[in-house]
Amino acid sequence: MIIGIGSDLIDIRRVEKSIERFGTRFTERCFTDIERAKSEGRKNKAASYAKRFAAKEACSKALGTGLAQGVFWRDMGVVNLPSGKPTMQLTGGAARRLAAMLPENHRAAIHLTITDDFPLAQAFVIIEALPIAG
């Protein structure tokens, strides 16, 4: 069953300006080590960071908290499954919020899609509760 849905749309130029203005202070505050390594290796760093920023916003909306109630930027990170499919890895307050949302004897599956088409980046997150086979 679906227990959370979130979406976000962001202007890549806004993220680019934040990177230019604040540099690593911005990227280290908002992004995990994995996200920074992935984005720094990209030709268009701003678009890569913008997609991940949108994913965090969408995930926080799917959690029903936004960036509040103990959910912080670095509690949510975009990671890739072995297949290459992106998903969200949650820690800290985001992981605690997700655990509180889950019905008993269920596990979470977080579905993520991210895209960009300059000047926009977009993300959708669906959080699904799946029964644990017993």
Swiss-Prot record:
Its EC number is 2.7.8.7. One of its GO terms (biological process) is fatty acid biosynthetic process. Mg(2+) binds at D8, E57. It is found in: Cytoplasm. One of its GO terms (cellular component) is cytoplasm. Its cofactor is Mg(2+). Keywords: Cytoplasm, Fatty acid biosynthesis, Fatty acid metabolism, Lipid biosynthesis, Lipid metabolism, Magnesium, Metal-binding, Transferase. Its main location: cytoplasm. GO terms for molecular function: holo-[acyl-carrier-protein] synthase activity; magnesium ion binding. It catalyses: apo-[ACP] + CoA = holo-[ACP] + adenosine 3',5'-bisphosphate + H(+). The keyword Metal-binding applies. InterPro entries: 4-PPantetheinyl_Trfase_dom, 4-PPantetheinyl_Trfase_dom_sf, ACPS, Ppantetheine-prot_Trfase_dom. SUPFAM superfamilies: 4'-phosphopantetheinyl transferase (SSF56214). Pfam families: ACPS. Belongs to the P-Pant transferase superfamily. AcpS family. Transfers the 4'-phosphopantetheine moiety from coenzyme A to a Ser of acyl-carrier-protein. This is Holo-[acyl-carrier-protein] synthase. It comes from Rhizobium rhizogenes (strain K84 / ATCC BAA-868) (Agrobacterium radiobacter). The lineage of its organism: Bacteria, Pseudomonadati, Pseudomonadota, Alphaproteobacteria, Hyphomicrobiales.
